[in-house]
């Protein structure tokens, strides 16, 4: 699952996404939020989708014992010598599960001097 999530996360960063949306019904649908709009990325069969969802819940310390309770979590993710802070929201439903990952620092670092040069 690590490699699969790394691929998804890398593609989200390349697309300048602020959020990654995962919705598991009879299949897993993944969408990226780019400039406020949801853009479809990939779909997976239900068994693979359930594994991805469980991986994300585990990484973000979401309690799997509370299946019908909305929860939040977070984790750090290292990619290409950069650490990303990810906030995770989990929303269960009667016939679906949804996870949204907010990428909190997906921009380049700007120094004070660089800010003062911006007109």
Where are these regions (language model features)?
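N-terminal "pre-motor" subdomain/linker immediately upstream of P-loop NTPase catalytic cores
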Residues: 1-119
């Amino acid at each position: 699952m690590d490699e699969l999530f790394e691929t998804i996360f890398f593609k989200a960063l390349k697309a300048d996404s602020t959020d990654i949306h995962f919705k598991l019904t009879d299949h897993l649908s993944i969408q990226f939020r780019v400039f406020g709009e949801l853009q479809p990325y990939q779909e997976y069969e239900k068994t693979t989708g359930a594994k991805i969802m469980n991986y994300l819940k585990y990484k973000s310390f979401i309690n799997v014992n509370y299946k019908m309770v909305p929860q939040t979590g977070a984790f750090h993710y290292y990619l290409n010598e950069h650490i990303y802070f990810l906030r995770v929201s989990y929303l269960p439903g009667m016939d679906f599960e949804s996870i949204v990952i907010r990428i909190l620092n997906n921009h380049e670092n700007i120094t004070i001097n660089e800010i003062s040069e911006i007109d």
